[in-house]
């Protein structure tokens, strides 16, 4: 099989039949337990799940983090033990030791196989221990490990309050000073008096949340809340009049739940990754809220000017996405805007409805930069991809950890895609972090060639 890079006029979508090569989605515990500060995550699975969490998260159990393993034993699988009693014992212990505001049960492959009725047990146990229990089945049947967060957020949508739950108490007690109440309680009560409420969904570090909130405040748009919030008690109001907008491309299940269960109005916008994406994201929200964007063009130009030292390294370079975390389309669009050529965008799963705005923006970016349209390959076959990489010889391959070393041994510079998941890549100011990750292998190669001359030695031995 030979691979040639055709100059396509429109986006080309292909679907192969490859296996999914990704982390287990229960890895979402790694960042969600830190994001929701008053939560406790209980992963219900086997020893394998425990080993994975222990190694992937890098936290020893002696540190007593706010997550734990409910390890299934032979007695559980053979139905000799009562699942309800065992989970009740563990949850009572969690309540006594940590007293969280919410316990999140993370189902795994094993709970699916043995048909554990977690959704049936949770309400009964919740009423007994008086702590909310959210059930999320973040098992290995998903396409990408980032979809674990999608599953948890979709489950939390049903726990978000509705407007009538807050307005009724306020109407019943007429002597309450609502002005002082708004000042005291903040956005949860303040949003009642707005015609259009905006809720953003997606787990981001608090510093990035603040940055995006400020960008919208500059346009006179107030964010009513975030899903997830830092505290479970601060979950945003979700109702039929609320506008919602996502910040990550892997949250299609959450978006569908928001629209179907709570009748929210989804704002379809490109994702705020890179200066171009952040500007388009803010502009789309402004158009929905009837605001004229102020100073966005100038702000984007300033950011690009500050990135010039990195742009000189990547202009004219080629990149190949093997596919791992569903961020590929957004990252490819940003790198094309930086002057790179993207040969192929491999992606485990593509929700074309949720990513419609991002795909249209990718197409527009390719036209503006006068570069060929990349192929988008859904569910790529890694054997075919390796062959195409061998033929195309890209300057950089963004890949999962499993393929990085074999590609490096064949003279292809690589970057782990998982690093983009944990890095701060959203908003105007974090664009530099994306290019820092992308250019690191390129700068390493320049150093080896320029000062040490090791590249020829390596190539001669391959």
Swiss-Prot record:
Subcellular location(s) of the protein: Plastid, Chloroplast
Cofactor binding mode and count: Binds 1 [4Fe-4S] cluster per heterodimer. The cluster is bound at the heterodimer interface by residues from both subunits.
Enzyme Commission number: 1.3.7.7
Keywords: 4Fe-4S, ATP-binding, Chlorophyll biosynthesis, Chloroplast, Iron, Iron-sulfur, Metal-binding, Nucleotide-binding, Oxidoreductase, Photosynthesis, Plastid
Catalytic activity: chlorophyllide a + oxidized 2[4Fe-4S]-[ferredoxin] + 2 ADP + 2 phosphate = protochlorophyllide a + reduced 2[4Fe-4S]-[ferredoxin] + 2 ATP + 2 H2O
Keyword Phosphoprotein: no
Cofactor(s), by name: [4Fe-4S] cluster
Enzyme kind, highest EC tier: oxidoreductase
Binding site for [4Fe-4S] cluster: 24, 49, 109
Intrachain disulfide bonds: none
Main location: plastid
Gene Ontology annotations for the cellular component aspect, listed alphabetically: chloroplast
GO biological processes: light-independent chlorophyll biosynthetic process; photosynthesis, dark reaction
Pathway: Porphyrin-containing compound metabolism; chlorophyll biosynthesis (light-independent)
Tree of life domain: Eukaryota
GO molecular function per UniProt: 4 iron, 4 sulfur cluster binding; ATP binding; metal ion binding; oxidoreductase activity, acting on iron-sulfur proteins as donors; oxidoreductase activity, acting on the CH-CH group of donors, iron-sulfur protein as acceptor
Family affiliation: Belongs to the BchN/ChlN family.
Self-association state and partner proteins as the record states: Protochlorophyllide reductase is composed of three subunits; ChlL, ChlN and ChlB. Forms a heterotetramer of two ChlB and two ChlN subunits.
Function, in words: Component of the dark-operative protochlorophyllide reductase (DPOR) that uses Mg-ATP and reduced ferredoxin to reduce ring D of protochlorophyllide (Pchlide) to form chlorophyllide a (Chlide). This reaction is light-independent. The NB-protein (ChlN-ChlB) is the catalytic component of the complex.
Name under which the protein is recorded: Light-independent protochlorophyllide reductase subunit N
Organism per entry: Pleurastrum terricola (Filamentous green alga)
């Amino acid at each position: 099989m030979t691979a040639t890079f055709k100059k396509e006029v429109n986006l080309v979508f292909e679907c192969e039949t490859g296996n999914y090569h990704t982390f287990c989605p229960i890895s979402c515990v790694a960042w969600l337990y830190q994001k929701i500060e008053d939560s406790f995550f209980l992963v219900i699975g086997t020893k394998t799940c425990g080993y994975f969490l222990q190694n992937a998260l890098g936290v020893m159990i002696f540190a007593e983090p706010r997550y734990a393993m409910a390890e299934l034993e032979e007695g559980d699988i053979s139905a000799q033990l009562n699942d309800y009693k065992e989970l009740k014992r563990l949850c009572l212990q969690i309540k006594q030791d940590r007293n969280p505001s919410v316990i999140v049960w993370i189902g795994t492959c094993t709970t699916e196989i043995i048909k554990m009725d977690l959704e049936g047990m949770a309400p009964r146990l919740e009423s007994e221990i008086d702590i909310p229990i959210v059930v999320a089945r973040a098992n290995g049947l998903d396409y990408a490990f980032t979809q674990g967060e999608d599953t948890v957020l979709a489950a939390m949508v049903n726990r978000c309050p509705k407007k009538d739950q807050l307005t009724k108490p306020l109407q019943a007690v007429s002597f309450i000073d609502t002005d002082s109440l708004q000042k005291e309680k903040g956005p949860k009560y303040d949003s009642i008096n707005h015609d259009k409420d905006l809720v953003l969904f997606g787990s981001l570090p608090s510093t990035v949340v603040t940055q995006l909130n400020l960008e919208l405040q500059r346009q006179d748009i107030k964010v009513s809340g975030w899903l997830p919030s830092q505290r479970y008690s601060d979950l945003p109001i979700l109702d039929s009049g609320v506008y919602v907008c996502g910040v990550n491309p892997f949250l299609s299940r959450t978006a569908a739940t928001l629209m179907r269960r709570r009748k929210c109005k989804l704002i379809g916008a490109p994702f705020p990754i890179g200066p171009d994406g952040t500007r388009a994201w803010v502009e789309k929200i402004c158009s929905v809220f009837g605001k004229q964007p102020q100073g966005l063009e100038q702000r984007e130009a300033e950011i690009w000017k500050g990135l010039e030292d990195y742009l000189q390294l990547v202009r004219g370079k080629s990149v190949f996405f093997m596919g791992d975390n569903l961020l590929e389309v957004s990252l490819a669009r940003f790198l094309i805007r930086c002057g790179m050529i993207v040969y192929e965008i491999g992606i485990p799963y593509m929700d074309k409805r949720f990513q419609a705005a991002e795909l249209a923006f990718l197409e527009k970016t390719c036209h503006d930069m006068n570069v060929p349209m990349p192929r988008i390959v859904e569910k790529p076959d890694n054997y075919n991809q390796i062959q195409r990489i061998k033929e195309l010889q890209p300057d950089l391959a963004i890949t999962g950890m499993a393929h990085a070393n074999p590609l490096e041994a064949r003279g292809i510079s690589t970057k782990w895609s998982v690093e983009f998941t944990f890095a701060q890549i959203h908003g105007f100011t974090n664009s530099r972090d994306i290019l820092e990750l992308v250019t690191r292998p390129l700068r390493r190669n320049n150093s080896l060639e320029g000062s040490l001359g090791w590249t020829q030695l390596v190539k001669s031995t391959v």
